[in-house]
């Protein structure tokens, strides 16, 4: 007798998939379908704050890092919620510049995107984030890196004391559900506020804003770009896949899961909300948590979506020899070119 629940979940996925395909039959990726899907994504992300709080940005410190200036600032995203933000400003000329919102993945927080130690010194090894924010500012892009909720200094106080290397994703995700919110939703909301901040800067070309995410930061980037058309170009590194092939196939952080989303969409459907705007997907061929087979499956569906919108030339991808990491061998230059044109 087999008492395990594996078969139950497999069957539930198939039943849900079949029902979803019936509901979207004949209208998949049409204007009506995309509008409905956007609404369902917004619903699955949970409640956003009812009042838009003034950002009130303050520059705390400015340092010269040779190739760029690093501003440490803070702004307010929600009542009683201040966010530490790094801003990398190019040295070539005097603005205005195209800009990028950089969304880091799991790890030490915003400093991973720059490759910095806690004291602000440059680390010897770039790590899996590959100093992507520095690579972008070197290409003449102003880069904003907010500390994402649940990482770095934005963890729960008790968890910072208990384990310096442990995120607060589990605590925040579970408790936010009790308020009709999700951690993914709060992160997307704060990404939208980061776009507000970028557009408020005199040295930013407001019509040329991109977003670059890695791993869980790609989730934030994909959903933010899908909901907010102020984003001109998007890079998703180390995340694009199918839910079935990744977060349903193995253990992943709880911050990846959205209530009821499979009733309406698989992951490529949601990423497809970015179309027809420019999108670049990169993934390591040996990424163990976002398997290559399912990356290829997602890319094929995204190509179909972009083709259907007569925008296939706006979609690019790179499967590089590597693991769960940022490559940037093609995506860095691609994003810079998109935002300059």
Per-segment meaning from a language model:
Residues 47-95, 99:
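N-terminal cap/lid segment of alpha/beta-hydrolase-fold proteins
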Residues 171, 178, 193, 231-271, ...:
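Mobile cap/lid helix-loop segments that gate and shape the active-site cleft of serine hydrolases
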Residues 300-341:
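C-terminal catalytic histidine-bearing segment of alpha/beta-hydrolase fold enzymes
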Residues 95, 103-189, 200, 246-248:
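Cap/lid segment of the alpha/beta-hydrolase catalytic domain
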Residues 203-215:
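Alpha/beta-hydrolase fold nucleophile elbow
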Residues 274, 281-283:
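Short beta-strand/loop motif that positions the catalytic acidic residue
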Residues 1-69:
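N-terminal targeting or regulatory segments adjacent to alpha/beta-hydrolase or S9 domains
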Residues 198, 218-229, 335:
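Short glycine-enriched nucleophile-adjacent loop
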């Amino acid at each position: 007798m087999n008492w395990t629940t594996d078969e139950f979940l497999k069957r539930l996925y198939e039943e849900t998939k079949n029902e979803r395909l019936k509901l979207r039959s004949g209208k998949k990726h049409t204007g009506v379908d995309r509008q409905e899907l956007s609404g369902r994504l917004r619903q699955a992300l949970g409640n956003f704050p009812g009042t838009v709080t003034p950002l009130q940005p303050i520059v705390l410190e400015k340092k010269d890092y040779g190739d760029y200036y690093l501003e440490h600032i803070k702004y307010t995203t929600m009542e009683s919620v201040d966010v530490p933000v790094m801003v990398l400003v190019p040295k070539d000329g005097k603005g205005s510049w195209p800009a990028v919102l950089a969304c880091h993945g799991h790890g030490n927080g915003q400093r991973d995107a720059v490759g910095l130690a806690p004291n602000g010194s440059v680390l010897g090894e770039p790590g899996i984030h590959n100093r992507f924010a520095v690579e972008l500012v070197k290409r003449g892009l102003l880069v904003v890196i907010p500390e994402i909720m649940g990482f770095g200094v934005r963890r729960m106080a008790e968890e910072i004391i208990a384990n310096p290397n442990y995120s607060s994703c589990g605590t925040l995700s579970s408790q936010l559900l009790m308020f009709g919110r999700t951690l993914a939703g709060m992160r997307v909301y704060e990404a939208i506020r980061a776009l507000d901040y970028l557009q408020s800067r005199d040295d930013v070309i407001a019509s040329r804003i991109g977003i670059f995410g890695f791993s869980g930061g790609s989730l934030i980037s994909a959903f933010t770009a899908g909901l907010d058309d102020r984003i001109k170009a998007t890079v998703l590194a180390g995340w694009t896949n199918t839910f079935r092939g990744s977060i349903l196939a193995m253990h992943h952080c709880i911050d990846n899961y959205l209530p009821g989303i499979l009733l309406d969409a698989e992951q490529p459907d949601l990423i497809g909300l970015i179309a027809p705007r420019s999108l670049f997907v990169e993934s390591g061929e040996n990424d163990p948590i976002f398997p290559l087979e399912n990356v290829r499956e997602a890319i094929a569906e995204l190509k179909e979506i972009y083709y259907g919108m007569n925008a296939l030339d706006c979609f690019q991808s790179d499967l590089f020899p590597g693991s769960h990491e940022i490559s940037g061998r093609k995506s860095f230059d691609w994003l810079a070119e998109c935002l300059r044109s």
